[in-house]
């Protein structure tokens, strides 16, 4: 399977670049900006893309690629900061612009007398999305300008003449953003026409490739899977089951942090999938270890370690553990942006004890959420399972802010059940990517039946997203929110105030902890 390597210079759009490439039917993966040519060569990409980034190529903190990247014999496309890194490397000059460009801009395609740019084949003058304060002010030798804008005379360039064989291209704007009208066509021109990549990546091809890898990795060893009933672990389990059959045994852990009646619901819908599943009730153990623990990072790590402890009690010569880790989990947990900071450890990634007795099989770790659902459909998993909202590995422990206790978990369960029930009744459940309730560690004064109350505050959260990397808060109807609030306050003892979270990601994360 042919692939594309995206070198990440810290852009907020890096993951979007990878997704757009996959939408063209081409597999893509992200590596750090400073990956060595040897490391890149091991991945055998047929093209390389340099992402945007927040720094300046002439600054002290400049992030620059290894020059050997341009000598690997594959086409290279630089986007925004990536274009500026190309210009600097080949001897051009980049400087701060007196007129910065953020948002829509009109791109004018250059019509060169000698030959048209293959990158701009069938691309007319059109709107593009800019996001830069620096610009190329002197063209590197052996390059030509292929497009311009009002404030950027060199908003696209390519190697030419003596350097034509290098096939190096640069765009000052972002083709991966929807506001760039012909962005998808530009990426197609680069990847399919220039790099000659055959679009052969699809859910079906992914499944075939993963089945081969799983069989090769597991051999004849037994494998255990921690299944939660969520989309990720269910798809991972079914995929591994198709690869190794009865070698796989699943354990569903009731950690005491699940939604209302979750254990019964999960066991019921897992039955038709043909999986071997054991229900392990470890709720007392989890809640004991979480007693008086308020730090979200400590809660995540305790839960991760306890999961492994429970799995180890159910081992029967298994050598491997299956996890439904996704690409966003890996990106958020292990920075690929050089100096950027980790946002938070993921339950599947950072919470595992270092001396775990099991080796990992993570068949979905290179997929985004919507791709997992597509793979699930190809595997024949029912739509009502695939369209369940994401549920965090640590469960309600990260939705009860502060210390976790049975009474507080019960309050949250009842409130969350009402919220989800009303979403489904109103036909809104499938229109939001994720919805849940959060029990806050504060109380507020209220009045009920002419009596003063001092009870808990609950926050409702609903977001719209594609893959969880970015998200907008869902603009649910006011009358709907009023109905949910009224039901919760009247039906759930211990809550006298309901708030609605209108924060987007970024700057907020989807979960509160």
Curated annotation (Swiss-Prot):
Annotated active site: 80, 174, 176
SUPFAM superfamilies documented for this protein: Adenine nucleotide alpha hydrolases-like, Class I glutamine amidotransferase-like, GMP synthetase C-terminal dimerisation domain
A GO-annotated cellular component: cytosol
EC number per UniProt: 6.3.5.2
Family annotation (CDD domains): GATase1_GMP_Synthase, GMP_synthase_C
Catalytic activity: XMP + L-glutamine + ATP + H2O = GMP + L-glutamate + AMP + diphosphate + 2 H(+)
Pathway: Purine metabolism; GMP biosynthesis; GMP from XMP (L-Gln route): step 1/1
Broad EC category: ligase
Alphabetical list of Gene3D superfamilies matching this protein: 3.30.300.10, 3.40.50.880, HUPs
GO terms for MF: ATP binding; GMP synthase activity
Protein residues bound to ATP: 228-234
Domain Glutamine amidotransferase type-1 as annotated: residue spans: 3-200
Pfam families: GATase, GMP_synt_C, NAD_synthase
NCBIfam families in the cross-refs: guaA_Cterm, guaA_Nterm, PRK00074.1
Record's subunit section: Homodimer.
Protein name: GMP synthase [glutamine-hydrolyzing]
Record gene name: guaA
């Amino acid at each position: 399977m042919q692939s594309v390597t995206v070198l990440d210079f810290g852009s907020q759009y890096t993951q979007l670049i990878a997704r757009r490439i996959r939408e063209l039917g081409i597999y893509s993966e992200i590596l750090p900006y400073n990956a060595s040519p040897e490391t890149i060569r091991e991945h055998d990409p047929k093209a390389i893309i340099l992402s945007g980034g927040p720094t300046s190529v002439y600054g002290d903190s400049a992030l620059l690629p290894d020059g050997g990247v341009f000598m690997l014999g594959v086409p290279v496309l630089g986007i925004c900061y990536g274009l500026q890194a190309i210009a600097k490397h080949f001897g051009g000059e980049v400087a701060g612009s007196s007129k910065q460009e953020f948002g829509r801009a009109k791109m004018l395609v250059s019509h060169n007398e000698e030959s048209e740019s293959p990158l701009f084949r069938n691309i007319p003058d059109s709107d593009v999305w800019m996001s830069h304060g620096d610009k190329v002010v002197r063209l590197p030798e052996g390059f030509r300008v292929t497009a311009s804008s009002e404030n950027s005379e060199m908003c696209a360039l390519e190697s030419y003449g003596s350097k034509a064989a290098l096939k190096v291209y640069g765009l000052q704007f972002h083709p991966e953003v929807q506001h760039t009208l012909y962005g998808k066509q530009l990426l197609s021109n680069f990847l399919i026409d220039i790099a000659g990549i055959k679009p052969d990546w699809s859910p079906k091809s992914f499944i075939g490739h993963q089945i081969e890898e799983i069989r090769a990795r597991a051999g004849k060893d037994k494998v255990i899977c921690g299944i939660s009933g969520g989309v990720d672990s269910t798809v991972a389990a079914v995929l591994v089951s198709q690869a190794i059959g009865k070698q796989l045994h699943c354990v569903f852990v009731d950690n005491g942090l699940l939604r209302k009646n979750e254990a019964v619901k999960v066991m019921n819908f897992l039955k038709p999938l043909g999986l071997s599943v054991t229900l392990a009730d470890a709720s007392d153990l989890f809640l004991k270890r979480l007693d008086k623990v308020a730090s979200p990072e400590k809660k995540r790590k305790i839960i991760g370690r306890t999961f492994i402890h429970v799995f180890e009690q159910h081992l029967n010569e298994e050598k491997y553990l299956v996890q439904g880790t996704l690409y966003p989990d890996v990106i958020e947990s292990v920075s690929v942006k050089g100096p950027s900071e980790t946002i938070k450890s993921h339950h599947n990634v950072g919470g595992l004890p270092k001396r775990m007795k099991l080796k990992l099989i993570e068949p979905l770790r290179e997929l985004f959420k919507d791709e997992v659902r597509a793979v699930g459909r190809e595997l024949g998993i029912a739509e009502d399972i695939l369209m369940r909202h994401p549920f965090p590995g640590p469960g309600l422990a990260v939705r009860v802010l502060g210390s976790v206790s049975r009474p507080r978990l019960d309050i949250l369960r009842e409130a969350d059940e009402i919220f989800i029930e009303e979403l489904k009744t109103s036909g809104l459940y499938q229109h939001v990517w994720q919805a849940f309730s959060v029990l806050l560690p504060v109380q507020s004064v209220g009045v009920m039946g002419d009596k003063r109350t001092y009870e808990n505050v609950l926050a409702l959260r609903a977001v719209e997203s594609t893959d969880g990397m970015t998200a907008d808060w869902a603009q649910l109807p006011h009358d709907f929110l009023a109905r949910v609030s009224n039901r919760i306050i009247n039906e759930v003892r211990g809550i006298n105030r309901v708030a609605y979270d209108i924060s987007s990601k970024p700057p907020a994360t989807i979960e509160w902890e």
